[in-house]
Curated annotation (Swiss-Prot):
Zn-finger segments (UBP-type): 5-102
Protein name: Ubiquitin carboxyl-terminal hydrolase 44
This protein's GO CC annotations: cytoplasm; nucleus
InterPro entries with a match to the protein in the record: Papain-like_cys_pep_sf, Peptidase_C19_UCH, Ub_carboxyl-term_hydrolase, USP_CS, USP_dom, Znf_RING/FYVE/PHD, Znf_UBP
Species: Ailuropoda melanoleuca
Region feature (Disordered): 237-264, 336-358, 689-711
Active-site residues, as the UniProt record annotates them: 281 (nucleophile), 635 (proton acceptor)
Top-level enzyme category: hydrolase
Encoding gene per record: USP44
Molecular function GO terms recorded: cysteine-type deubiquitinase activity; zinc ion binding
Residues annotated to bind Zn(2+) 1: 7, 9, 79, 82
Biological process annotations from GO: antiviral innate immune response; cell division; chromosome segregation; negative regulation of mitotic metaphase/anaphase transition; negative regulation of ubiquitin protein ligase activity; proteasome-mediated ubiquitin-dependent protein catabolic process; protein deubiquitination; regulation of mitotic cell cycle spindle assembly checkpoint
Localization terms from the record: Nucleus; Cytoplasm
Recorded family membership: Belongs to the peptidase C19 family. USP44 subfamily.
Length: 711
């Protein structure tokens, strides 16, 4: 990389103290939303992608003539007028100060000083929730609401346009006629019901009083229960109005009228974007995938650890700190017509009346976050429960996952800050923490936890343990005596190496095809161990235990085969390799994969005998994709199959769009998720009957037949 020691345009730079680059939530291109190669203009607040992505930063220079820009992640400075990277700073040392501030924001370490004592506006913050304060949260909550409202308005306008066009067509006119006839039928049913009620009331009034006062009192109390609306009988105007509708027709129309009153979801459940809070695309992609795995989502929609967590924590620690109630950490709906603006929001014991739980016709959506909770009160299971409730409520087009990010920072310190992270590492750490939390749940004051709750926790733990859990058969064969030694090893994902032809630098590597089946075959192929290094039990069996003779070492070969298939198969493609001592580069070749994967060729013989052929078939459920060329930079998106709408969705942080299977198969996959079509016990549903029967949709009253999606 060529650099200039001195650039005259840097000397003319005057950087504002409240530059937008200090907000991690703006570390993405304003045009294409990518977080790869992000350049911030140092003359204004514009942030865009570099010339090797979509050239939006270059276009901004051509339109505004602002020459100097800074790469947010690598912190290089580039001058477009000089067309070169620069090293010098201006007289006030703004670039050095800006780099120090960016490093502090990424690491969340604000113990930094400058020689002159001059600091930027945000330099004095010392809390690790730097950009999670109330002002920022409130601003983003309003933006989320406005985004959802704007999307909803656009959908309504588009629906009106298509409805007008549809009404002019022959099919539309026929539909209008049917609806008109249905209205008349409903009106006749209502009128007939009112007439019957009036007749019943008239008959009750003409009945003679009973001799027994007790029976007379009972009769009076019985008549009070029926309070019909008195409507004067009208003479039928035509024979058609005299027609009596049958009872079955009454029931059918009554059901139709009841169902028509149900609220349709604003968006298709699950089609909710997650705002990028500052290089958090790795977290957003993983959360989108986990929420679209049916068995995983249903478990955490059912389980909420917040209720007993506060009880056990307060009883165990006796801390003066009061754990925030569930309404302090979940998405709620507050009354929109509330006249007293200074009054506190109403408290609800559960999510049934909140954003995630039900349908409130006159409520305003609001996101409330925990305030500086201690780490022992934080529950990742509760945060997943809350977030999944919101994402699958059908009410939000965009959500800012503040609480989830805050919990990750506290419970997984390696991901604290706004630095770019690896999605595979985050997924492993997140699942490990969730499993540990569920395992330790029942041991903390079990007497205070209801039996039903402990049973539910045990069921969810069983699902979490088994959903990704499989077993490998490691078989070592001695080449001297042909003795085989078998070892069973657990696995939660399969890390697949690329073939040898992709491990070296070459110009024609990307043009050579590669498929995931080839990588699976490489994973399960027989591998020769180098030299005589294997201690064979059979070859050393004749040697006495305390004999002075040396141990016999032989040559051997090793093979890995799958002996127990997981319910959800995770395939991690090892795209990053070491190049030199401290550099990791990416293997950017496209890996072909299919919608249906047959795992039978990669299983051991015992599994082939014990399982039915249907158990080896897997369906593609999700794909995590990495955009970029390096390990420490890039952008993550995810392709997820939405079971509610029956379509594939491309999840790019806040932007979600419908896509086809062909588009999914063209993705540069990093992690593949396949769901077993039929489990070993022969069931197609992976969810336990106890959880499946008791689970509820987060928006029970929503009509999920609507297939509208974000455009």
């Amino acid at each position: 990389m060529l650099t200039m020691d001195k650039c005259k345009h840097i000397g003319q730079l005057r950087l504002a103290q409240d530059h937008s680059i200090l907000n991690p939530q703006k570390w993405h291109c304003v045009d294409c939303n990518t977080t790869e190669s992000i350049w911030a203009c140092l003359s204004c607040s514009h942030v865009a992608c570099g010339r090797y992505i979509e050239e939006h930063a270059l276009k901004h220079f051509q339109e505004s003539s602002h020459p100097v820009a800074l790469e947010v992640n690598e912190m290089y400075v580039f001058c477009y007028l000089c067309d070169d990277y620069v090293l010098n700073d201006n007289a006030t040392g703004d670039l050095k100060l800006l780099r120090s501030m960016l490093s502090a924001i990424k690491s969340q370490n604000y113990q930094c000083t400058t020689r002159s004592g001059r600091v930027l506006r945000s330099m004095g913050t010392s809390d690790d929730t730097y950009y999670l304060h109330d002002g920022t949260q409130s601003l983003l909550q309003n933006e989320d609401q406005m985004y959802t409202a704007l999307w909803h308005r656009r959908r309504i306008l588009m629906s009106k346009i298509f409805r007008t066009w549809f009404e002019q067509s022959p099919t539309g006119r026929k539909r209008q006629e049917e609806q008109f006839q249905e209205k008349i039928a409903k009106r006749e049913v209502k009128k007939r019901r009112q007439e019957l009620e009036y007749q019943v009331k008239a008959e009750l009034e003409t009945i003679h009083p009973r001799k027994s006062l007790r029976l007379q009192g009972l009769a009076q109390s019985t008549t009070v229960e029926i309070v019909p609306v008195q409507v004067p009988l009208q003479t039928p105007a035509s024979p058609a109005k005299d027609k009596v509708v049958s009872t079955s027709e009454d029931v059918r129309l009554k059901k139709a009228s009841d169902s028509s009153g149900k609220r349709r979801p604003i968006v298709t459940p699950g089609v909710t974007g997650l705002r990028n809070l500052g290089n958090t695309c790795y977290m957003n992609s993983v959360l989108q995938v986990l929420s679209h795995l049916l068995i995983f989502r249903q478990c955490f929609l059912k389980l909420d650890l917040n209720q007993w967590l506060a009880v056990t924590a307060s009883d165990k620690t006796r801390s003066p700190y009061k754990h925030p109630s569930i309404t302090d950490t979940v998405y709620q709906m507050n009354e929109c017509q509330e006249t007293d603006t200074g009054s506190a929001p109403s408290r609800h014991p559960s999510l049934s009346l909140g954003l995630s739980g039900g349908a409130s016709k006159s409520r305003k959506m609001e996101l409330i976050q925990p305030r500086e909770p201690s780490s022992q009160y934080i529950s990742l299971c509760h945060e997943l429960h809350t977030l999944f409730q919101v994402m699958w409520s059908g009410k939000w087009a965009l959500v800012s996952p503040f609480a989830m990010l805050h919990s990750v920072w506290r419970l997984i310190p390696a991901f604290r800050g706004y630095a770019q992270q690896d999605a595979q590492e985050f997924l492993c750490e997140l699942l490990d923490k969730i499993q540990h939390e569920l395992e330790t749940t029942g041991t903390r004051l079990p007497a205070l936890i209801p039996t039903s709750q402990r049973k539910l926790i045990k069921q969810v733990l069983n699902v979490v343990n088994n959903i990704f859990h499989g077993q490998l058969l490691s078989q070592v064969t001695c080449l001297a005596c042909d003795n085989k030694s078998n070892t069973i090893e657990p696995f939660w994902d399969l890390s697949l190496e690329f073939p040898e032809r992709y491990q070296c630098n070459g110009k024609d590597i990307a043009s050579q095809p590669c498929r995931v089946t080839e990588m699976l075959a490489k994973f399960t192929e027989t591998e020769a161990l180098e030299g005589k290094i294997y201690v064979c039990d059979h070859c050393n069996s004749k040697r006495r235990r305390f004999s002075s003779k040396s141990v016999v070492l032989t040559e051997a070969q090793k093979q890995l085969m799958i002996c127990h298939l997981p319910q959800v198969l995770r395939l991690h493609l090892k795209r990053f390799r070491w190049s030199g001592r401290n550099n990791r580069e990416k293997i950017g070749v496209h890996v072909g994969f299919e919608e249906i994967l047959n795992m039978e060729p990669y299983c051991c013989r015992e599994s082939l005998k014990s399982l039915r052929p249907e158990c080896f078939i897997y369906d593609l459920s999700a794909v995590v994709m990495h955009h970029g060329k390096g390990f420490g930079s890039g952008h993550y998106t995810a392709y997820c199959y939405n079971s509610e709408g029956g379509f594939w969705v491309h999840c790019n942080d806040s932007k979600l769009s419908m896509c086809t299977m062909d588009e999914v198969c063209k993705a540069q996959a990093y992690i593949l998720f396949y769901t077993q079509r039929v489990t070993e016990n022969g069931h197609s549903k992976l969810l336990p009957p106890e959880l499946l029967s008791g689970s509820q949709h987060p928006n029970e009253e929503a009509d999920t037949s609507s297939n509208e999606i974000l455009s």
